[in-house]
Amino acid sequence: MAQNIGKVVQVIGPVVDVKFQKDKLPKLNNAVNIELNGHTLVIEVAQQLGDDIVRCIAMDSTDGLMRNQEAVDTGSAIQVPVGKATLGRMFNVLGEPIDGKPFDTKDVVMHPIHRHPPSFEEQQTQPEMFETGIKVVDLICPYVRGGKIGLFGGAGVGKTVLIQELINNIATQHGGLSVFAGVGERTREGNDLYYEMMESGVINKTALCFGQMNEPPGARMRIALAGLTMAEYFRDDEGQDVLLFIDNIFRFTQAGSEVSALLGRMPSAVGYQPTLATEMGALQERITSTSKGSITSVQAVYVPADDLTDPAPATTFAHLDATTVLSRAITEKGIYPAVDPLDSTSRILDPKIVGQEHYETAREVQEILQRYKELQDIIAILGMDELSDADKITVSRARKVERFLSQPFNVAEQFTGTAGVYVTIGDTIKGFKEILEGQHDDLPESAFLLVGTIEDAVVKAKKIKG
């Protein structure tokens, strides 16, 4: 079959216009190849302008590209490898390995990155809790199987370690796989994550794909779709429960806004693209549970200037089922994971879904921590002695609850020297209930720090007492 060849007519940064023969225009989202400086530059069709010209977005640098160069329509969208061959490997937006190891493409299945979301009939509509084995997450902001979770936190509060522990737990306890999409990531962070995963041993259950900060907006826009396509294969063809990490979802929106004006669109609020909600919806609607398996997505959310009303985070919030907020104030107390139990939320923390006992225990934990927070000013000024007996008991139990929300992680074992633990939701509820009921008022609060179950705390207390 003869190749469909066009000619480059205009280059504006990452946006390239190509003229094709009449009646031979490539379809929207098709990949078009241009030979440039000894390698193939891939551009993706974004618009058909009339006069047989298509406007495309480049997936790599357009340095050195000239008018009248030949451009070949591939006839399909950008394709990435899927399946077992991707595990333990790192790819770019075009599905090319970037970890420096050989990659045999002979029997590898390739899938296009643009796909339709599952139909309503295929989706599983019954909300179901996804057990992570992390006490504070399961109790306070339980994740929905096939849901979307927003992970909020500044630098150095433990986002990466929490992500690694989730990858480890889904691999060891659920036999599941993970896909990590680095969207507009710092190259250094991606590099650190890769080597940390190799050290902690979870790399073989994970596929990684990166569109780094230094890459053109086209690559950063599409890398989330590349990662999602890899995850969809594990869900649909292998019936797996998959964890999909997107770090950072804001960069996906940011990349879209960078090319929006060059594509000739009028900017909307705060200079964002007018198609913001559509682009976000196209990505998020593909992340769901089906009758075959599920994709549960954890998305790191950067909030520009801490303004939650900014259109980018505000559009993301509309899709989230749960939010996990990491707090620097909690890391300063030495409590890890540093999840803020008063700021984190979940749509399924509802007695109809998680059960009455779970719901009541979670709410009581939040109530006692809130009361402790209110009393802290009094304690700071007047000291503990000025509190009523009831408030003294509240403070004592709240401090134990606060410490019991911490837990040793498997992936941090080489730093802490403490073996990590996976705690079932039943054990989690039982432990917090016993503390709230006052069954462990006689134990020192240090016994509750970095332990798994309540039985572990009792054993630790005996060791402390000698």
UniProtKB/Swiss-Prot annotation:
One of its GO terms (molecular function) is proton-transporting ATP synthase activity, rotational mechanism. The lineage of its organism: Bacteria, Bacillati, Bacillota, Clostridia, Eubacteriales. This is ATP synthase subunit beta, sodium ion specific. Keywords: ATP synthesis, ATP-binding, Cell membrane, CF(1), Ion transport, Membrane, Nucleotide-binding, Sodium, Sodium transport, Translocase, Transport. It is a peripheral membrane protein. It comes from Acetobacterium woodii (strain ATCC 29683 / DSM 1030 / JCM 2381 / KCTC 1655 / WB1). SUPFAM superfamilies: C-terminal domain of alpha and beta subunits of F1 ATP synthase, N-terminal domain of alpha and beta subunits of F1 ATP synthase, P-loop containing nucleoside triphosphate hydrolases. The gene is atpD. ATP binds at residues 153-160. Signal peptide: none annotated. It catalyses: 4 Na(+)(in) + ATP + H2O = 4 Na(+)(out) + ADP + phosphate + H(+). It holds the Pfam family ATP-synt_ab_N. It comes from the Bacteria.
